[in-house]
Amino acid sequence: MTLLDGKSLSVTIERDLTEQIAALVSQGVTPGLAVILVGNNPASCAYVQMKAKACKRVGIYSVTHEMPSKITQDELLSVIEILNNDPNIDGILVQLPLPAHIQTSKVLEAINPKKDVDGFHPFNIGRLSVNVDTFVPATPLGVMKLLESYHIDVRGKDVVIIGMSNIVGKPLMSLMLNAGASVSCCHILTRDVKQYTKNADIVCVAVGKVGLLSADMIKEGAVVVDVGINRLESGTLVGDVDFENVAPKSSFITPVPGGVGPMTIVSLLQNTYKAAMYRLEQRMRV
């Protein structure tokens, strides 16, 4: 069994990205990321702080717009419009989830697709589905980079994804299909998840339920990717996989923490750099 070490890989990618950003800055373009945080959800606040620190490490200018939880949808859309028109902001990220009175789809659709570094705009989702270059959601992108770094070729492989969220499951399914995998997606209405996972070459779990994937659900030598992040009452972070029992049976497996999480952050940084490169290209055409 080999651990898919996202933490060490993310450090390597950050080092390379820092050099690329420095070269970009020397041409007069400093990548800029605007993060919108609505309310004071502890998990959301922690994620935003992690993103800000990561931006600082690689040389990306980042600014966080903290909004009260009672902000109206129209007020939030106005903030996004200002950022859409700010020439110093290359990427716009709205931290999810949003309060119940705000329609998430409307907010995400308001972001300029060329600044949608989260890859959640329908325009970018559509481009991903037809395998055209676009912004790819950070977590699925991080999963693919992690597999690639360990020379795990998904072409012709049977892949099962448990979870069909717009953030992870669906875009990951598109990426896997684009890479030549045969993909099945299990969700809350799937009657027998084990029936799908027991013969899969690669199993990706992104649900948010402790111990969802047990050892009897995978075949010997399967690759297991755990996207779940759950905090136990003791404060310990665990994923969706029964790691202790699944790991000995797998050929590769991601730990939690230290697997997919760091790759999500670094993929966001790469998307922001990509958006800044677009700005430079536009400037050079003038």
UniProtKB/Swiss-Prot annotation:
GO cellular component: cytosol
Annotated residues for binding of NADP(+): 163-165, 188, 229
One GO process term, biological-process aspect: methionine biosynthetic process
InterPro entries assigned: Aminoacid_DH-like_N_sf, NAD(P)-bd_dom_sf, THF_DH/CycHdrlase, THF_DH/CycHdrlase_cat_dom, THF_DH/CycHdrlase_CS, THF_DH/CycHdrlase_NAD-bd_dom
Biological pathway: One-carbon metabolism; tetrahydrofolate interconversion
Coiled-coil intervals: none
Reactions accelerated catalytically: (6R)-5,10-methylene-5,6,7,8-tetrahydrofolate + NADP(+) = (6R)-5,10-methenyltetrahydrofolate + NADPH; (6R)-5,10-methenyltetrahydrofolate + H2O = (6R)-10-formyltetrahydrofolate + H(+)
Recorded superkingdom: Bacteria
Keyword field contains DNA damage: no
Keywords, sorted A to Z: Amino-acid biosynthesis, Histidine biosynthesis, Hydrolase, Methionine biosynthesis, Multifunctional enzyme, NADP, One-carbon metabolism, Oxidoreductase, Purine biosynthesis
Listed GO MF terms: methenyltetrahydrofolate cyclohydrolase activity; methylenetetrahydrofolate dehydrogenase (NADP+) activity
Enzyme Commission number(s): 1.5.1.5, 3.5.4.9
Pfam family, one: THF_DHG_CYH
Family the UniProt entry places it in: Belongs to the tetrahydrofolate dehydrogenase/cyclohydrolase family.
Stored HAMAP family: THF_DHG_CYH
Assembly and binders: Homodimer.
Role of this protein: Catalyzes the oxidation of 5,10-methylenetetrahydrofolate to 5,10-methenyltetrahydrofolate and then the hydrolysis of 5,10-methenyltetrahydrofolate to 10-formyltetrahydrofolate.
PANTHER family in UniProt: C-1-TETRAHYDROFOLATE SYNTHASE, CYTOPLASMIC, C-1-TETRAHYDROFOLATE SYNTHASE, CYTOPLASMIC-RELATED
UniProt-recorded name of the protein: Bifunctional protein FolD
Protein's gene: folD
